[in-house]
Amino acid sequence: MQPIRRTPRGSTLLLTLAACATVSEPRSAAPAPMTMANAYPAPEDSGQRAPARYFLRRAWVQLTRDVARTRLPETVGLDLREMEQRPFAVAWLGHATTLVRAGTRWILLDPALFTYVGPVRGFGPKRLTPLPLLPEAFPRIDAVLISHDHFDHLDLASVRHLAAQPGGPPRFLVGRGLGQWFAENVGVEAEELDWWDRLPLGDIDLTFVPAQHSSGRTPWGKNETRWGGWVVGLGAQRFYFPGDTSYVAELFRDIRSRVGEIQLAALPIGAYTPREWMRFEHLDPEEAVLAHVDLGAVRSIGVHWATFQLGDEEPYQPALDLDRSVQAHAVQGFDVVPIGQVVDVPEPTPSAVDQRPSPPVATTNPEERHVPAGRRDAAN
């Protein structure tokens, strides 16, 4: 357990009531795009918004919690030299942020590298657990993969920091419609992909896959950009990162069918209460176990928990609930690991070697990847 200061009063409320905040990002002057939707059926009541009393209750729970006495996951220092020697390895850096070493490449997913996440700089949910590596000590990143534009997955300060790395910015790969935001706020081009698009990065192949979630950074920008997950492939080995998603069995089975065997998955297990609202957006630990089974994953690790307090559950509760669900379903290969621990992507099974994909080719037109949102067909 690590002593952490109590989150300043009002900082969480600013994020949970973000619609009332003054954001530090300009509103795009581009034509308004069409609204995007999930690819899989959702419950009839999934379009409802949480009432104001929910945000007030959540803010009260978080503001009155004694964080200094709260159980938190262990954080270990990340040894980049050790990780660099691994042929294909992953390190969870807290929340959804994940560093991947694949071959000779460094890939970073959903970077949130600083103290707060939220629409107002210096406010919002405060980091409970430290990064295992200071932002200034990161290796030169080859590609940054963004799952969707919610503040805890697309942090403006973090992507600006990465864009200014020595040697030039990494490639930023994002969902359809999000390139305009990067041009206006980060000053770099981002390559847009849609669901099932596949893109080469040297000998690595990257696939943008569906997720059952939503997008939007402002009250006027709901579901205008594509959300999804990523599969990072190296030969016959595959690492799956869903970003945020709710549970739809068909979604995970389709990923298994279309992409092939998943050797390692980083499945979100936190921010799942209260279920009457969170079930439309986030997996709970038991659903994460079901997703692990649906994917046929060789191994899964739990992420998206105990870093920023975004749900009503206690920070360590996801790990306890995951352990119970793993035992209840008699599942193997799914656990939690310390923040910063290097995890090897397991070797593929013989059947997975037979499923090895053809050499990656870009399945999106490079000329279309940087077209501003609103100038492309936003049909689903």
What positions do the PLM features span?
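Metallo-beta-lactamase
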Residues: 15, 20-137, 171-243, 263-270, 321-341, 345-348, ...
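Active-site metal-binding motif and surrounding structural segment of the metallo-beta-lactamase
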Residues: 51, 121-173, 189, 259-266
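Cap/insert and terminal regions of metallo-dependent hydrolase folds
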Residues: 21-46, 127, 143, 171-180, ...
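Bacterial N-terminal signal peptides that target proteins for export
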Residues: 2-11
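Catalytic core of the metallo-beta-lactamase
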Residues: 97-103, 200-261, 279, 283-286
